[in-house]
Amino acid sequence: MKKGNVTINNPKAAQALDMARGWMGKITPKGVLGYKEEESRTVFQNGDALFMRNWPYVWQLSQADDSPLKGKVGVIQLPAGPEGRQATTLGGWQWSINANTKNPEAAIALLKILSDDDSQITRLKMLGHAPTRVALYENKDVLAVAPELTQFRDIFAQAVPRPATVTKAQYPRVSNAIFNVTFSVLNGKEDGKKATEDLQKRLTRAKGAGWR
């Protein structure tokens, strides 16, 4: 989506979906259509898959002492087509304060603690959550225990946010439409052209007179 416009019905999007469909049963097991993050990680970490797309926490688990992949995993940006650009999905973990809280000062003080350098380093070590503070990607002490951040830094710099901000309250509906149409291509029920036409209609209906 560009500036809130629905632009999914185009040949390049259709071609990308058809390409992914062509991987099914070849370089991608058909069972992947039923996987969530942890199922994907288990297959990959057991050495039964060559590639995996997942969140940063997986790196730490793959390098654990009991992991058969310790020292054998690399991280790269998602591939792009000839005229595209490499980009990953930007997500995050957010803290928020209820506007009706009776103790806003205490709530703000707590969030400052939970989001400071020390807390983010602890979350990185214990949970594998990548920091949101850019300075930590240059911190030698942090890199000593999490060298993967040198790779993540450049990848995150090229990240593209999900359309949640643009689509506002309609994002769950948008996300569900994208999921269902993509799934229908990957399981062979329709081709990329039909899917992008269908998705264009669904997203246009969701938008209505404007995202709100």
Predicted regions and their residues:
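Paired acidic/hydrophobic, glycine-rich loop segments that form the ligand-binding mouth/hinge
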Residues: L50-N54
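Glycine-centered hinge/linker elements that transmit conformational signals in sensory
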Residues: K2-G34, L78
